[in-house]
Every structure is written in C-alpha cells, then in structure tokens.
C-alpha cells in the first residue's frame, strides 16, 4: 500500500521542555494507527505537527511523498482536542463556512450530518449543543472534505 504520511525524526520543544523526541512513523493508505501513551506524552502535539497546527523544532513531515505544505489540508481531515466550532452558528452553517473555503458541494454537508446523526438540529446554535453533539459536529467537519488522511484525537470524548 502507498505511504500517505511519513515523519523523520520529528521533534518539538517548548522552551526547555521536549514534548516530542525523534518520532519516525510511516502511515499507509487505508490503515488505522493509534498513538498510545500517558497524559503529557506528546500524542496531541505529534498530531498537530501532522496537520501543520504546530511546526516541528526539527525533523520532517511528508504527505503523499512530499514535504507537508498548506495545500495538503485539502486532503486531510482532523479533530484534535476541541472541535473548532463557531458557537453562534448552526451545525449546517458551521459546515457551510468550511465547504465554501474548500469548494465542497453543499450536498456533502447533508451526507456528513447524516453520518454523525446531526441532520435534525435545525437552527439550533452549536453553543447550545451538548458536549457529545459538539464532538459529533467536529467529526463531521473532519469528514467534510472526504479526506485521504483522517486524524482524530480522542474522538469519543463526551459522545452520548
């Protein structure tokens, strides 16, 4: 199978604290990988480097055989830690913002809302959602672009 993500000696320091130290991983298409470790082990930090949310102190992140760049976000879906929601917008409106930015057809919004069982939330604002509903909306956002690489950090947090 084709390699979709590869890291070489990935490191991340915050001041004098080493959060990630020499992580090398190869992720193949159509595979499921998990990062295991105690709190503070650097799992979320590593995932943030995979998506460009953090820059490595040293090392490289390769996506589809080339060094990661912003254009790759069109093919990556992610939910890391807290869902990135506009609390004053409905589920549909939250997805419409992203669909417009990524040139995704509006019918995809209905598809992902059905996948996460949020198709009947109407005009209710995301800020009024339960924690589980917010998490499901975050998963819908991650799935919206039908990503080649899907990164989920504790995706079952708060699910009802």
What function would you assign to each model-found segment?
Residues 139:
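Hydrophobic anchor residue at the start of the ABC signature
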Residues 51:
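Helix-to-loop junction immediately C-terminal to a conserved catalytic motif
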Residues 96, 100, 106-121:
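Conserved ABC ATPase "signature" region
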Residues 59-74:
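Conserved ABC transporter NBD signature motif
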Residues 150-154:
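Catalytic Walker B motif of ABC-type/P-loop ATPase nucleotide-binding domains
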């Amino acid at each position: 199978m084709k390699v979709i993500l590869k890291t070489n000696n990935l490191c991340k320091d915050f001041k004098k604290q080493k959060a990630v130290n020499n992580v090398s991983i190869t992720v193949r298409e159509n595979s499921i990988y998990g990062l295991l470790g105690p709190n503070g082990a650097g799992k979320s930090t590593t995932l943030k480097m995979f998506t460009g949310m953090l820059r490595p102190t040293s090392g490289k992140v390769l996506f589809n055989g080339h060094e990661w760049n912003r254009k790759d976000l069109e093919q990556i879906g992610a939910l890391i830690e807290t869902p990135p929601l506009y609390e004053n917008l409905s589920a549909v409106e939250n997805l419409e913002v992203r669909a417009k930015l990524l040139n995704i057809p509006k019918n995809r919004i209905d598809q992902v809302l059905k996948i996460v069982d949020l198709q009947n939330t109407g005009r209710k604002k995301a800020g009024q959602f339960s924690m589980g509903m917010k998490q499901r909306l975050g998963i819908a956002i991650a799935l919206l672009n039908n990503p080649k690489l899907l990164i989920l950090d504790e995706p079952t947090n708060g699910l009802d």
